Amino acid sequence: EPDFIKPHFGLRLFPVWHIGTDYLHEIGKNWYTHLTDNGVEFMWNTKVTDIDFIYKFINFSSKNPKFNSVSSYDRLMFGVGKSGIDFGKQLAEKYDLPTESKPVQIGVRFEAPQHHFQKLIDISYDFKLYKKFDNVSLRSFCTNNNAAFVAVEDTYGNHSYNGHAKKDMTYRNDMTNFGILMEIKGIDKPFDWSREAVKKLQIAGTGTYYSPSDRIPSQTSEGNFVRCVVVENMEPLHDALGIENANYIVDFIKDMT
């Protein structure tokens, strides 16, 4: 265990295999083929509009005339994800379904030259750093090394920032990026709170970028600069999360330096 993490973090060792973003497409295709070959039917361009949990019917609208607008079911696995959480809340209220609030999970993506983390990478490619307080815990996740890039994705009408790493070393840039995820307990309506926090973090739907050393935003694997708004200080983070919560993230980063 590298000496520099002992005062601040816990290190847990798990087996890790790096697939690479460039090879993940093939795994997705194989997974899809396996399911369809075994009788699973995917309904694309289809939106569920209502679920009757009493009589076991699903209503949906589809651009594909092959599918009916109503279908019955014997068993239902209901998973809406974050994009469908409002729909899930509507159904829970309509049918008086029991729900449980979960802690808020929100964070930032951090990027730095890889040599700063090489001791950890030599132990585990996707190393995990943890730090815990009374009602808040922080952890690193989704670590990318060697040929590591930040990519912008459109999520709910705003930009979100994801890390990618290619297996093909012709793309090598010797950078490391990972998310710093903060879990906050005791917040009423956690998804609404986090959605508002993201809006405050962004400017015109685009994420903000801050570098204390005035580094320019990184490039994507296609050679384009990552779309973002460069800011001069941490005020957007303070405004979005509150000074106390923002300082937890700042302290997490300082403990790595």
Where are these regions (language model features)?
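Residues forming the flavin
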Residues: 1-257
